[in-house]
Amino acid sequence: MKLRTLTLIANIAALPTLAQEHEHGRVSPVGALSAKPRISSEAAVANPNAASRKNAEEFIGAVERELPIETEYGNRVSWIAANFITPDTDWLSAKVTAELASTTVARAKSATKFDGVDVDPRTRRKLELLKRSLVLPAPEQPGASQELAELQVRLGTAYSTGKVAHRGNQLTLDDIEDIMRTSRDPNELKALWERWHAVAIPMRQAYARMVELANSGARALGYFDTGALWRSWYDMPADGFSRTTERLWSQLAPIYRNLHCYARARLNERYGDAVQPRTGAIRADLLGDMWAQQWGNVYDLLAPKNGSLGYDLSEALVQHGYDAVREVKVAESFYVSLGFPPLPESFWSGSLFVRPRDREVECHASAWDIDGKEDVRIKACLRVNADDFYTAHHELGHVYYYRAYQDQPAVFRDGANDGFHEAIGDFIGLSSVTPIYLHKLGLIQQVPGEEADIPFLLRMALEKIAFLPFGYIVDKWRWQVFSDQTAPADYNAEWWALRTKYQGIIPPGPRPPDAFDPGAKEHIASSTPYMRYFLATIYQFQFHRAACRIAGWNGPLNRCSIYGNTEAGKRFNEMLRLGASRPWQEALATFTGERDIDASAIADYFAPLERWLTEQNTNETCGW
């Protein structure tokens, strides 16, 4: 999802790319360098006025020889920088980022030289992917790539190394999140929330300069701004993508408002009007999560008054002696049950599973494809709890996606779109938390009856439905920033305008004039595009519904687990193997039979909960 060194390559040049969003090439540096000399990608377009089909094919051939070498180089540097955060690795990261960003920008511009050339469809798609492979394109002027890279590293490091004082201790974000999961003291929650958000205050000036540089680079490539570039990634016009996301949100807003209404009433019952009124928006610090993006940590406050899930997965994992490695081993066994191969030994020896005690690392979970062959890894600071049990299944989704498309040409070694890459593991995650699966693992003694469905669905909604508006507004805010609709002086005010409008969330108190609260979210600090997570939340339910149909499941979607169903696994793998070689609409149809993203699967999954919430909210004044 995110990491400090996503800054390094993926966020400035998505080809080559790294970590869980993307994959890398298969040609080894030794093999490539020992081969006889070939034309380079620069030489292939040395005379753009003479561009021809042959030139285009030579250009793509050169790119696909060069790209795997560069990608492995960048990945290895990035892995070290993420696992050993020091001024030296920051310096190295910035240098490599600048080098690879310049190369990727040059390739994108070279690809435009062939816009009018008649080439075969696969070559045309490769050219288009190269043109839109950038996240933050640097301008061509001398020093711009280096400055942009240094800004990215500075922002990412400020976030990754941020700490706050609390009760005589210096707390990391992980420490703060542990407290926010369980504390029900509104004064403590407010203090921690405000102190963490203060970490982002120094970022605003650097962020504004980064936006200025990236926009200059995007305009040089023919885009109106960087936001327009980002919206061009989805095999449809940029304006069409905006309309698609608006359509999806309109499908989802009613159930979110219902959930918000219910949660607000329960919080009011706990804290009273002085802390959380029965009407209006919800305080951002009361929902068990620093960003109020997922509310599962306050399930104890929101649980139905009648009915129980019947088990605590976190407790069960501890009681059964799980550790971080076992969580990942069990996740691997799920994919193997679908017909996928076991992970190579290098995965187990090369990955980081727990936070080391001797150094600073970027702890947010991420998946890596180091060399486009067998060297796949995850980097995570896993703990034994339900969240990280799910995380293990999620991250391996990225890893198995890398392995599925590793035989594609280098330019096609990526997800059908970035939402697909995030959705794969979450789709498996939907099966991994079902009581049927947990019972097969021996983690629970019996599968609860239908009386447990509402508690189960409410827990799921607090993670999935609660996330949707946040997943939608992060990039809406950035699109406004990139388009200059939101000036630096208004960054924070507009952030909260969007959060209030779509999420119904407000800060716990007045914000200082120099606040830069968006920067308190890692994806803003690292410039990781975020709409992928909104899309992924929708895709995962669409995948789940299709897989359950393939498996012959006839019951409620929330009770379906595809564990052990090789037919569903076969169809799933057919989609994964395509990588980016076909538009995402075709990849989607390969697995689901549907060509458009559709939120109706979410409505199907949560239909029993929607009816229950409507009943619970009968006497409430919903909305804000």
Specify the residue positions occupied by each region the protein language model found.
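Active-site-proximal, well-structured secondary-structure segments within enzyme catalytic domains
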Residues: 169-174, 182, 209-379, 449-461, ...
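Bacterial N-terminal signal peptides
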Residues: 7-16
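C-terminal, non-catalytic "cap/extension" segments appended to globular domains
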Residues: 45-56, 89, 130, 294-309, ...
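Active-site scaffold of zinc-dependent metalloenzymes
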Residues: 187, 194, 358-385, 392, ...
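N-terminal helix-rich structural modules
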Residues: 22-25, 44-212, 227, 521, ...
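Boundary at the C-terminal end of the N-terminal hydrophobic targeting segment
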Residues: 17-21, 35
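Post-HEXXH active-site segment of zinc metalloproteases
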Residues: 227-228, 232, 402-427
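Post-HExxH zinc-binding segment in Zn-dependent metallohydrolases
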Residues: 241, 245-255, 415-452
